Amino acid sequence: MPVKKYLLKCLHRLQKGPGYTYKELLVWYCNNTNTHGPKRIICEGPKKKAMWFLLTLLFACLVCWQWGVFIQTYLSWEVSVSLSMGFKTMNFPAVTVCNSSPFQYSKVKHLLKDLYKLMEAVLDKILAPKSSHTNTTSTLNFTIWNHTPLVLIDERNPDHPVVLNLFGDSHNSSNPAPGSTCNAQGCKVAMRLCSANGTVCTFRNFTSATQAVTEWYILQATNIFSQVLPQDLVGMGYAPDRIILACLFGTEPCSHRNFTPIFYPDYGNCYIFNWGMTEKALPSANPGTEFGLKLILDIGQEDYVPFLASTAGARLMLHEQRTYPFIREEGIYAMAGTETSIGVLLDKLQGKGEPYSPCTMNGSDVAIQNLYSDYNTTYSIQACLHSCFQDHMIHNCSCGHYLYPLPAGEKYCNNRDFPDWAYCYLSLQMSVVQRETCLSMCKESCNDTQYKMTISMADWPSEASEDWILHVLSQERDQSSNITLSRKGIVKLNIYFQEFNYRTIEESPANNIVWLLSNLGGQFGFWMGGSVLCLIEFGEIIIDFIWITVIKLVASCKGLRRRRPQAPYTGPPPTVAELVEAHTNFGFQPDTTSCRPNAEVYPDQQTLPIPGTPPPNYDSLRLQPLDTMESDSEVEAI
């Protein structure tokens, strides 16, 4: 019950309102507010009132303008970048090493046999077109060639370039097509790409035949390797005990067993040291060469795949623990026959994230499915870009590219199942829209670690020590008394911290909420002499104004409803006799005849009779003497 009474009281208070008029509220506010200016408006003479009103209005506008500037600056989410230096014992970076050739030619020769013969015939046509004979191409398998052939574009007449088939019609007839040859100065090699039905064809031009041949060979090799099982591809690569000859971390010996294998399609079998997936990351005791990682690698250059790997050396990359190594984009080469020393400096990048920076903390707010999540690695923008491209490949070409992970239920592209995949892939790769779409959807990681490298090289081994070093390494790996290694196939690496000083580049908000409140309060106090309480007072008067306005509107609506006019009486006014009869007609019978002479019959008289209600008998109208009423009251009391 007390709660009900309290609620009813509150309801009545709301319905009643503040109890003031607009003018009374304004006068009360000007008399009681702590803001400078309003009190002078009502206390001074007419001229000063006008002057103080204009000054108060002007300064109020200045305060609102300054507030708008500060709020806009705060909502721009600007950041300030600070650089700090630190010194501490740091974890040694993860080191990924690969061979430039993804496979051993001796193990993939049976897969590339037809492609190798076709490639030799292509080079013969490019280098010596007039000396080539028909019988040299009669044994070639043109199944691969017909999907994506190389052509010659004769540009001796720039206004009318002529496209020539590199082999003419020699694989279909005994006579070559006329005019199907031209010299190297007048022709350029291009790749012809056609859709499945052959109605749409484009040409990918190159400035050099070397680029055209290499690109075409990699495209055809991708078609072949995409149809091989992953475990078979791993077996065709370089084994860890064949590529890693010696390992030393600080003063502790290590071997290929301390490396985690991973298959990278561009470089085959790669091996990661100190990845930190199953073991704790190794710290570096001190800066300097003696406390880093020393490796001797055998790249086996004599077993490289022709045309697929034109660079001899080791490919390596330094990265943070539990991150996927994107060696093709971020790796470096170490040349064979040299000792490469890599000094490392550490930079830590720490971003604020949304809304200050367009970065992500863990990739959970990125709309792209991370195809590298199966490796249990952290998010990176390269993983997002590759996943985005693979998603576009599947959507546009109905298959995935061999170089990137494949979503569940999808298949890799190949000429047998997807005849026009090369046309679709290269069109998508050259699409600016695709790149911009992926760049807009992917975000940089807010927290990143970058390793700045200083690289120096020297010949290794020297001529004086080459013989005994190669003998020892051959004995350790092959148990052979003869030299089984070559200087052209070995690489020595020294990776170490130059110093333990590290830099932290950190973002911080340039304008935080404390900055905003202090500036808002400073401007309000400077121009108006007010505080937060003054704003509360102003808010109170605004609420009262709204309250009064609502009550007035409600009352006005109710008054309109009450004053709504009723339908007017259409008949003539009744006479005195009719009124008397109405009061004495206790049966409420309608009149059938009129008492007036020359009475006219109105149609509404029968339908709208005057009610005959007798006057009420009120006890209060009974007049009695005062003493009689008092006696009656006494009797009732008794």
UniProtKB/Swiss-Prot annotation:
Residues 1-50, 552-638 are cytoplasmic. InterPro entries: ENaC, ENaC_chordates, ENaC_CS. It catalyses: Na(+)(in) = Na(+)(out). Coiled coil: none annotated. This is Epithelial sodium channel subunit beta. Belongs to the amiloride-sensitive sodium channel (TC 1.A.6) family. SCNN1B subfamily. It is found in: Apical cell membrane; Cytoplasmic vesicle membrane. Originally identified and characterized by its inhibition by the diuretic drug amiloride. Its main location: membrane. It is a multi-pass membrane protein. Expressed in lung and epididymis. In the caput region of the epididymis, expressed at the luminal and basolateral surfaces of the ducts and in the smooth muscle coat. In the caudal region of the epididymis, expressed along the luminal border but not continuously, in the smooth muscle coat, in the interstitial muscle tissue and in sperm in the caudal lumen. GO terms for biological process: aldosterone metabolic process; artery smooth muscle contraction; cellular response to acidic pH; cellular response to aldosterone; cellular response to vasopressin; epithelial fluid transport; erythrocyte homeostasis; gene expression. It holds the Pfam family ASC. Residues 598-620 are annotated as: Disordered. Disulfide bonds join C98-C270, C182-C187, C194-C201, C247-C254, C359-C446, C384-C442, C388-C438, C397-C424, C399-C413. Glycans are attached at N135, N141. It comes from Rattus norvegicus (Rat). The modification Phosphoserine is found at S631, S633. The chain crosses the membrane at residues 51-71, 531-551. Component of the heterotrimeric epithelial sodium channel (ENaC) composed of an alpha/SCNN1A, a beta/SCNN1B and a gamma/SCNN1G subunit. Interacts with WWP1 (via WW domains). Interacts with WWP2 (via WW domains). Interacts with the full-length immature form of PCSK9 (pro-PCSK9). Interacts (N-glycosylated) with BPIFA1; the interaction is direct and inhibits the proteolytic processing of SCNN1A and SCNN1G and the activation of ENaC. A motif (PY motif) lies at residues 614-618. NCBIfam families: ENaC. Keywords: Cell membrane, Cytoplasmic vesicle, Disulfide bond, Glycoprotein, Ion channel, Ion transport, Membrane, Phosphoprotein, Sodium, Sodium channel, Sodium transport, Transmembrane, Transmembrane helix, Transport, Ubl conjugation.
